[in-house]
Amino acid sequence: MAKNLAHKTIVDDSSRCSCASADYLLIFRKHGENPVPIEHPVGLLDYAGSREIPGELLKYRGYEGSQIKNRYSHWIWRQYASAFWDDVRLNRVLPFKAARDEEDEKHVHPLQLDVIDRCLVLWSNPGENVLTPFMGVGSEVYGAIVAGRRGVGIELKESYYNQAVQNIHEAHEAKPEQGDLFADVDES
């Protein structure tokens, strides 16, 4: 934890304290019509977050009638449409400590899977390709596979790449119908 965020700093000299920096999700859209709509005909089915879904809404999950009445999907959408995602589970991340080297930056931490799950359901269709140009330990590719998408990741650091391969194999085992992701990879 950063020293300026520690309670001890407040006790010793609060002029040195600070507040935590927020994470930001930047969304870029290409102008024009989307030729392949991302549809949810029975609403949003799964919630990625820490809040408990109210029990009375569960009967609406997968509701096939008018989506105006789908209170389950509406509840999930209100969480996702919020300007602040304060319900993201900070500890829901892939293993990463084994990939760290001594000379790594101190800020290295994988993206939370709740954020990835939300992005995948909102901005991609099952079966589509998801690209992550900074793969790290493979969180986005892992999430893509679990969500029924194909993931393409680029990583320069060998220790991160090796951890990503392990993490992605776990996603593959969770989704055996996806086929062998590494059938053509020479691991030597």
Model regions: which residues?
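Core catalytic lobe of class I
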Residues: M1-N162
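S-adenosyl-L-methionine
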Residues: V165-S188
